[in-house]
Amino acid sequence: MSETSKQTSVEPEQIVTDDNALRAAETILAARYGGTPRLTVTETLREKSRNRVLRCAVEEATTDSPVSVIIKSVDGEGENAYDPDNDAPNGTGWRFYNEWAGNAFLDRLNLDPPVSTGLIGGDRVAGLIVLQDLGSEGKSLADWMLAEDRPALLVALRSYAASLGRLHAETIGKEELFSQIRREIGGTETIQELPGAKMLRESVPGFRDLCAQVEEPLPPQFDAEIERIRAIVDEPGPFFAFTPGDTCPDNHRLTETPYARFFDFEFAGFAHALLTAAYIYLPFPTCWCVNRLPEEAVTMMENEYRKELSLQCPSAKDDALFYPQALAARAFWTITTLSWGKGAVEGEDDTWGISTIRQRNLLRLDTFADATEKIGEFPALGDLSRRLAANLRTRWNLAEEMPLYPAFRITANETKSEGAK
């Protein structure tokens, strides 16, 4: 049976309880492997209003069946309750179809080593998918980011960047296959607003308001450079590839191979690859585990990413094409994240994960301004970012840089001590 075949084991009006999810998942396993499998929940990995993720032991399994699986189910609540016939952009159903189609699409490519978890099957009506269980002992990049083992972190950073490059390289030119799979499982392929156009509508007004609030004038070239960013992001040309949509450092599993296996595809689809690669530079604009990476680590990650991407995308070797496009992607995320809460100018600073919102905003402004000078593109926005960072740093009385990740602090501190002697 195809991994994208529809199942109808749960009535549409039923709320998916754990028992309902287990019965639906058992039907999927039986269709795939035969027998009469029974599932027992051994661990709840995530339980939020949007979705639940369960680890389950497989009992009475056939020889071919795995002994443990992962169930990911979508629920939603209120107006966002899951409806299999509602594929409106950004809704619960839309995220579910992205998740299922993303996993099925990557499985269909039959890559060795694999780049995703491995899909067993899904149930459209119940709103769940069953995935291979990669086990509970492995690590992600986030684990090493919190540790003090520098060699291990460098290996993890290299694997993360190479894996992104490989994922993008292997999926360029295959957007119709992804769309076909999404239709097969019940998605209606509603037109999604392009990210650059969405930035113009949602983020740029907030960024303008932030600048006005702190009395930082916009340069005359502001609108022209913003339009250029929109055009690059929405017209990716050779860089049009599959992206998971949320490549935070804990949304994958590092493996014994040089490559990671990605998961969490709720926002997956085809877009400008460098919007995802921008996570290397900023770093990680939508994630909780943000500190600062030393420049040599960023350069290493960039080289690994470009090396893998260029295997299927020769344009990635062209500095004159790659760097302006990558910088536009960084500008997109800088403007987008600064517009959230208008940069948290007033009131108390908020901590998210291992750093504060203000620390993140200053880091992104600083790194973007530095990059505009180095690459020689978007000079007006680069100058504005430099001025805005200085303005906010004074207002917030934040003189110190964002801390380095723990594994890099030891070397930095030792260097400072040696210099003081």
Features from the language model and the residues they span:
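Conserved NTP-binding catalytic cores of kinases and kinase-like/nucleotidyltransferase enzymes
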Residues: 1-125, 220, 235, 255-260, ...
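A cross-family kinase active-site recognition segment
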Residues: 2, 121, 126, 149-215, ...
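Active-site catalytic-loop/activation-segment of kinase and kinase-like phosphoryl-transfer enzymes
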Residues: 2-21, 180-231, 369-382, 386
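Conserved short submotifs of the Hanks-type protein kinase catalytic core
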Residues: 126-138
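AlphaC helix of the protein kinase catalytic domain
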Residues: 140-150
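Catalytic-loop of the protein kinase fold
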Residues: 242-244, 249
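Catalytic activation segment of kinase domains across protein kinase-like and atypical kinase folds
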Residues: 250-283
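Active-site activation/catalytic loop segments of kinase-like enzymes and analogous catalytic loops
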Residues: 275-314, 328-348
